Amino acid sequence: FEVTDGLSGMLKLADGQVIGGLVRLGDTRPQVGAFDALRVEGETDYVGAEEWIEFIEAFEAVSAEDAAAFRDRLDYVAINVGTLEIFGLEFLDSSLRVTADVDHWVFDVIDDELKGQIRLSDDPSTPVEALINYLSLTSDDEGDPLLGVQSEDLVPIHVDVRSLVLDDEDY
């Protein structure tokens, strides 16, 4: 199938349900692949982590049965992102991989400035987990980027940073 210039795919269906296949984002068409699970690959100019989280929560709220079936069939989403925004920070030319685990969604991010994982639990009372192996930030002259942000504006999150580099200084 080809929906637009930037979305195409090959899917195997049974009784109106997706069994497997490949969905391709971007200008290249999908190559023949396995149909044992659903895979999404490609590239896009922009992804916002908050939008992904909101989409998953809304999707699961609409139909738990459809969400469970999708989750069971999904092997992975692997996309190259021009600009990846995560909680107000922007990263350029990132690799993003999304998988469904037993009780949470997993977002793996690899970038020159960031390497880590965000875990979104199925339990809405469980905070989002950000497990950061490496984070390199450069300060700017604009002051505190979080000035004016209130705690009620943020989702509950647990952050574990193993290596933080700020302006070339390793903390």
Please place each PLM-identified region on the residue numbering.
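Membrane-proximal interfacial segments on either side of biological membranes
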Residues: 1-171
